[in-house]
């Protein structure tokens, strides 16, 4: 590995030191002003209670450190003409990032009513954490942000996601020492083993040790520096330390650290790109240790504040009520000497702006933080090239995800030059039958390789790490900066990112309301190895509840699809990969599955989202006696098997079969953009006939989606009810009363008049279930009549 030493130590001139400090002081002033001031933004008169916000909200403690980093990033971006993005892990330091955006002018360009003058400063202060204003965190409303930082742990994964396939981009990532204690952040350190120095950009982690969380010390700030260095070097970084509480000394040391780090990054990238990458790089990082709440009140009411946990939020909490707090606040604000930082009209002075880059080089104006501006349509080949031939329903079987894998392989090939599509997953690409993609791209890997390894590739675009958090963080960062991707995961274990998807949906919902944010590619989940075919791994691997979780979220941003076969999966995949600003959840099987629909039929059915399969039922021109509804591949097979049994045993019964692909179709139109009108729903499911619904997941979800429908009282749902174990595939459905025999029994029980007339049929079905129990316990396999079942029209 090439070595680099910074031969000439960075020596800031007096002018550079003065202007850097002026910028930092201005940002600190603006950050504090946002927390406290309702009026008198430039302190042109003595501060009075009337100038103070009635409710003080915000986080001061991290803001001076974020302002310091932003100031020094400005310096190196301008000096080196860098294309840069910053991920602010301590997103509760929103006042700092807003202050810097206003200083550089990107805020006023985004929000012209918040001008870069005294009037605009007053509005900037008033709107912060104020009704009708802006949130306290680095939310989507903040120019330059791709990471809100409200829920901690995801900053570093987002930063790496942004850097992948962005070879000219520097992504700085500020990691708070509180966030550094989270599990997702701990796993994210390993992302450097996946960063390709040839095709990817660089990530510069900046670990900010200000010593405290809300009310406790932080772990990494209280271990000896040699131990911390060992930890960070073990993660694969070369730490550069900056420690101090004297502003001028810290400015000089931080400028030196940035230059050393970026010199090393430039050398590493240049060597890899000119000579080829042959071994893993030890990337630099900065460890910045400064006081929490630096430059704020040293003491309040006789208790230390600066450099303690008491500086975390609002260090002076009673400014309106307490004259001493008001006096301290005015002294604090005037300590920044705002008259030197802003002219009489409130505009930043030349010294303040001396370090600020221009145009799109400004952190608040980078198009990488508004990725939709950079997004190109994904080249998706014609589906007919990959469709399975279906001459008649149920005559052939295919593994749906394997068929999808062929499509994804072609997408990988078609994006090989432009490199804007990635497949991520926690070590499950091959298990989920998507391994055809390895013919187009290997698995990204920069660590040691052995002869036994397969498909590892320093330049690969398939990303596998056994951390669902890191997978999701990578993909979110990749999407937010204008690219495309797919997250493949075992259905049960996607719950690990429940909270992460909450945050992404919130981001999408807010972004949709901002005209200046361009739509980004959707976050697409492929959930497979699902509940009904985890018979071999058992109860721990059986949980279909992610769909329930997602459908609780903002309806304008979430979609859920359960394609029943290979061709419908292709159609759904084509749709979600083209979509924008959604979280799409696709649940599909990887085991051999009957092919029900031709490609043409699949397109039409998926476009409807729900529809009648006339060939599967026995209803003629009249009304049905019963509706058999299904959603999901295994429930669809069981419904069709039940329909066949009814045709044989009760041929006079008029059975309608309805298949649902788009779960949100069940919602009322006023509750979801895809929802059906009552007229449509009643036409499909009737208002007065029994509906036996076989559903892939927890049955209560169907009741919740359809509770307001006219015929809800006639709706009877079968699904997974936590009756799981290691057993045979068919026993899984029997244990949960989703099997064909139970569905026929439900029909007999619920169609008026059948209870007596069809008692013998019901008994036959019950006997079949009894026979099943005895058979599997003796033979360990399903009944031949089940294992060898085929659809016969």
Swiss-Prot record:
Transmembrane segments: none
InterPro entries: Phosphoketolase, THDP-binding, Transketo_C/PFOR_II, Xul5P/Fru6P_PKetolase, Xul5P/Fru6P_PKetolase_C, Xul5P/Fru6P_PKetolase_CS, Xul5P/Fru6P_PKetolase_N, Xul5P/Fru6P_PKetolase_ThDP_BS
Keywords in alphabetical order: Lyase, Thiamine pyrophosphate
This protein's record includes keyword Lyase: yes
Enzyme class label: lyase
Example of a GO MF term: magnesium ion binding
Cofactor(s) this protein requires: thiamine diphosphate
EC number in record: 4.1.2.-
Domain of life, per lineage: Bacteria
Family of the protein in this entry: Belongs to the XFP family.
Protein name (database record): Probable phosphoketolase
């Amino acid at each position: 590995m090439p070595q680099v030493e910074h031969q000439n130590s960075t020596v800031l001139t007096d002018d550079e030191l003065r202007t850097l400090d002026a910028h930092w002081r201005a940002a600190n002033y603006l950050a504090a002003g946002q927390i406290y001031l309702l009026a008198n933004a430039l302190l042109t008169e003595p501060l009075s209670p009337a100038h103070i916000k009635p409710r003080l909200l915000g986080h001061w403690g991290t803001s001076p450190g974020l302002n310091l980093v932003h100031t020094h990033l400005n310096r190196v971006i301008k000096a080196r003409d860098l294309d840069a993005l910053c991920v602010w892990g301590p997103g509760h330091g929103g006042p700092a990032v807003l202050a810097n955006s206003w200083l550089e002018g990107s805020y006023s360009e985004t929000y012209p009513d918040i001008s870069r003058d005294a009037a605009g400063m007053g509005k900037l202060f008033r709107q912060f954490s104020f009704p009708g204003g802006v949130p306290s965190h680095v939310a989507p409303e903040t120019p330059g942000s791709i990471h809100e930082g409200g829920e901690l742990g995801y900053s570093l994964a987002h930063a790496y996601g942004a850097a992948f396939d962005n070879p000219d981009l520097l992504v700085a990532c500020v990691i708070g020492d509180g966030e550094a204690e989270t599990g997702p952040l701990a796993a994210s350190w390993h992302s450097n083993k996946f960063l390709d120095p040839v095709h990817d950009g660089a990530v510069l982690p900046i670990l900010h040790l200000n010593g405290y969380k809300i009310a406790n010390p932080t772990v990494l700030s209280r271990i000896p520096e040699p131990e911390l260095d060992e930890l960070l070097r073990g993660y694969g970084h070369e730490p550069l330390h900056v420690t101090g509480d004297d502003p001028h000394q810290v400015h000089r040391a931080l400028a030196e650290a940035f230059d050393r780090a970026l010199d090393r990054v430039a050398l590493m990238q240049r060597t890899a790109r000119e000579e080829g990458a042959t071994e893993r790089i030890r990337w630099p990082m900065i460890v910045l240790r400064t006081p929490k709440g630096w430059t704020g009140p040293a003491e309040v009411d006789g208790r230390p504040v600066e450099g303690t946990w008491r500086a975390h939020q609002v260090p002076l909490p009673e400014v309106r009520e307490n004259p001493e707090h008001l006096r301290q606040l005015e002294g604090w604000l005037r300590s920044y000497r705002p008259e030197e930082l802003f002219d009489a009209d409130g505009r930043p002075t030349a010294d303040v702006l001396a370090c600020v880059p221009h145009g799109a080089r400004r952190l608040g104006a980078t198009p990488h933080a508004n990725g939709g501006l950079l997004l190109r349509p994904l080249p998706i080949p014609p589906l007919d090239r990959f469709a399975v031939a279906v001459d008649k329903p149920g005559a052939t079987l295919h593994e749906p995800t394997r068929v999808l894998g062929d499509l994804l392989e072609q997408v990988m090939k078609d994006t090989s030059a432009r490199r804007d599509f990635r497949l991520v997953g926690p070590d499950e690409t091959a298990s989920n039958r998507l391994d055809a993609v390895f013919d187009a791209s290997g698995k990204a890997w920069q660590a040691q390789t052995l002869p036994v390894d397969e498909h590892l590739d320093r330049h690969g675009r398939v990303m596998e790490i056994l951390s669902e958090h890191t997978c999701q963080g990578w993909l979110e960062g990749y999407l937010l900066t204008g690219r495309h991707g797919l997250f493949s995961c075992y259905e049960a274990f996607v719950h690990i990112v429940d909270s992460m998807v909450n945050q992404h949906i919130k981001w999408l919902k807010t972004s949709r309301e901002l005209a200046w944010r361009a739509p980004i590619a959707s976050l697409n989940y492929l959930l497979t190895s699902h509940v009904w075919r985890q018979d071999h791994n058992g109860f721990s691997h059986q949980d279909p509840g992610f769909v329930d979780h997602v459908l609780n979220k903002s309806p304008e941003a979430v979609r859920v699809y359960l394609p029943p076969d290979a061709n419908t999966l292709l159609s759904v995949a084509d749709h979600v990969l083209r979509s924008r600003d959604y979280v799409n959840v696709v649940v599909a099987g990887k085991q051999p599955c009957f092919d029900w629909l031709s490609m043409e039929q699949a397109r039409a059915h998926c476009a409807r989202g729900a529809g009648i399969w006339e060939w599967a039922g026995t209803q003629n021109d009249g009304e049905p006696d019963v509706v058999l509804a299904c959603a999901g591949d295994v429930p669809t097979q069981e419904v069709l098997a039940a329909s066949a049994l009814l045709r044989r045993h009760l041929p006079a019964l008029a059975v309608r079969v309805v298949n649902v692909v788009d779960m949100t179709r069940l919602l009322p139109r006023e509750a979801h953009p895809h929802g059906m009108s009552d007229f449509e729903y009643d036409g499909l499911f009737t208002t007065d006939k029994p509906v036996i619904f076989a559903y892939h997941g927890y049955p209560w979800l169907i009741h919740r989606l359809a509770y307001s429908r006219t015929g809800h009282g006639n709706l009877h749902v079968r699904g997974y009810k936590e009756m799981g174990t290691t057993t045979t595939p068919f026993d899984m459905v029997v244990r949960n009363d989703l099997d064909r025999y139970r569905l026929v029994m439900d029909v007999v029980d619920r169609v008026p008049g059948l209870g007596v007339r069809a008692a013998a049929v019901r008994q036959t079905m019950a006997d079949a279930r009894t026979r099943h129990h005895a058979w599997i316990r003796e033979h360990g396999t399903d009944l031949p009549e089940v294992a060898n079942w085929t659809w016969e029209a």
